[in-house]
Amino acid sequence: MQKEEAKELIKSLVEKINQWNYEYYQLNKPSVSDLEYDKALLELEKLEKEHPDLILSNSPTFRIGSFASEKFTKFVYQKPMLSLAKAYNYDDINSFINNISKIVPTENINFNIEPKIDGLSIALRYKQGKLVKAATRGDGSEGEDVTENIYQIKSIPKLINYFNDLEVRGEVFITKNDFKKINESNNFANARNAASGTLRQLDANIVAERNLSAFLYEIVEPEKHGIYYQHEALEFMKNLDFPTNPFSKVVEIEELEESISDFAEIKNKLDYDADGLVIKLNDLQMWDKLGKTSKFPKHSIAFKYDVEVASSRITDILTSVGRTGKITYIANILPVLLNQTTVKAATLHNHNFIKDMNININDEVNIIKAGEIIPKVISLKEEKNYVDYYKKATNCPSCGSQLVEFEGIVDQFCTNDECPDKNINNIYHFASRNCLNIVGLGLSTVKDFYPKFIKNIKDIFDLHKYRAELIKLPRYRDLKVDNILNSIESAKNKKFSKVIFALGIKHIGQRAAKLIADNYANFAELLDDHNLLKLQNTKNIGPKIIESLIEFISSPANQDLLAFLDAIFNYEGKAKVISTILSGYTFVITGVLSEPRSHFVKLIEEHSGNVSSAISSKTSYLLAGSDAGSKLEKAYKTGTKVINEEQFYDLIKQ
C-alpha cells in the first residue's frame, strides 16, 4: 500500500472508530457489531504498526473506553483501569503465552479463566468495611462516580467483614431474563446497553427497579492483602460475599485449548451475555513484571469467539482413541466453508452428547470452529420430533478391545495397554515440543516407526540400534535419521519436571510436574516416599493429582519404566538436598559475585532454599554482589534483608 493511501485509510478508520466509540460508550446505541468494530480496530493497529509516522493524536488505539460523562462527578484512578487485548484464534493465544514465557518459566505458568461478561466495568472502594465509592471505567484514568446507583444493586455488599482499605473491580450486567422484563417498557438494543444506560441514570430509583447484577474479578494491589494468585483473590472476595463467577477456574497451558473450545458450547446457554473468555496469568506477583502497553496489561487477554456458524450433513460417524484411552466421536460431513477454511469433519465429543442432541448419520447439523481450533457440532439444524441417535460404540477403533465406562465420567475408555493408537499417541506426547522436544520424532514419524522399531517409550532410546534399517525407509536418509538420534541423546539431559510431564499422567500438567520435581530429585526418591507424604504438604498439589500419581506408580510396568528413565537420564539442574538449613527461605540474587549465579542457586537448593527472579513480599534475602542496581534499591524500599557472600556462607554453615 502506498503511503498516501495508508494515510487516507488511517484517517478514515480513526474517524469511524471514534464515532462508534461515542455511540457505544456515551449514547449506549452501537451502530455496528462487535465483530465489525474489532476488525476495523485490528486494521488500524496493523496500519499504525507499518506506518508509525502516520499515527494521529486522536487515534482510538491510545484510548481506553470513553471520556467520563459530564452528568457525574469525576473519579480519578490511582491505578489505571485498563481494557484487555483480544485474541481471535489459538495462534494469538500462543503468542500471548510465548511473550509471558520470556519472563516467567513455562513450568510456573498457569491461568485463571472466566467468562468475559458483556457489561459495564466498575470499581468499588471500601474503607473500614464500608462501601464508600463506586465508579465506571471511563477512559481508564478517570471514571464516573456512580456510588448511589451501585448501592441499589442487591448482590454488591455495602458492608464487608474486612476493615483494611480495599478496591475491587468487576462488571455490572443484566441477566437475559431481567432484560426481557425491562424491554417490555423500554427499547434497548441489547442487555449491555440496558446495563450501561441504567447505571448512568440520575434517578437511583430506576436503578433499583431494573435489578442489575454484578461479578467481581480483581483486587487492586492484592499483595497488601496477602494475596499472590488470582484464584486466591477470587476466593478472598467470595468469602467476603462479593459475587464471583462460578465458571472461574485454574487451567494449565495444555488445558487452555480444550477450555476455550468447551466454553464455546456453553456460553450461549448462560443467563447473561458472555462474548468471550478472559485468560489471566494466575501468578499476580508477575503482573507488574510483565508490564503493559498504553491500553492493555500483558498478563491477561480476552479470547473472542467468532460467531460464524455453518451447516452441513453428516455422512458418517467414527470413533478415535487418544493417548489416555478416551474415545472421541467424530462426524464426517459434506465439505463446507467455515472461517475461510474447508471443513470435512467435526467432533461430537462423546456418546452422551450424541444422545442428548439426538444426532445420527444423514442429519443436518450446525458447526462452529471455536477460535479456529477444533470444528465441532453444536446442534441439529432442525430438531427431530422422534428419537433417532447413533448407537454407542462397544469396541476400540484401534485394537478392538471392549470399551470401559467409569462411574461419574461421561466418556468411554480403551484400557488395553497394547492398543496401537494409545501407544503411538503416548510416544508422540513424550517426544513433543513441550515435553522432551525430540526434533524429528513427530506423529507421522512415530507412525512410520511403530511397531517394528518403537512400541513404547523405552524403545525410543534403543532406536540407535536400528540406524542401518531406518535409513533404508522411504523418506528417511542418513541426515534425517542422525538428527533424530542426536536429539534423543540430547533429551537425556532434560529437567526432571519435563520427564514427569512427558509421561502424560492424568491431571499432571507442566506446573504440577514442576512442583513434584521440586520435592524429588528422581523417580527413585518419589517411589521411596510412602503415600507421597511430601506432596501432601505441598501447596497447589491437590488430592486428584496425588491419587492419579499413586495409581500410575503402583503399576509394576510403570515402576520398571521409571527405573529405566532414572538410569539413562542425567536430569538437568537438580541439586541434591544435603540439609534443610534454608528451608522456608526465598533468595533473590543480583550483582557481580565471585562465582557464577548457578553456583549460588545450587548451594541454596542443596540446603532446601528457594530462588526467585524478583523481589516480593515473600523474599527473605537479597544476595547482592557489586553493581547490584535496581534490585538493591527495591530491597531497601521494601525492607528486604540484604546480605553479601560472606554472610551467605555464614548462613549455610550454621
Swiss-Prot record:
Pfam families: BRCT, DNA_ligase_aden, DNA_ligase_OB, DNA_ligase_ZBD, HHH_2. The keyword Zinc-finger does not apply. The active site is at K116 (n6-amp-lysine intermediate). Residues 577-654 form the BRCT domain. Keywords: DNA damage, DNA repair, DNA replication, Ligase, Magnesium, Manganese, Metal-binding, NAD, Zinc. One of its GO terms (molecular function) is metal ion binding. GO terms for biological process: DNA repair; DNA replication. Coiled coil: none annotated. This is DNA ligase. It comes from Mycoplasmopsis agalactiae (strain NCTC 10123 / CIP 59.7 / PG2). The gene is ligA.
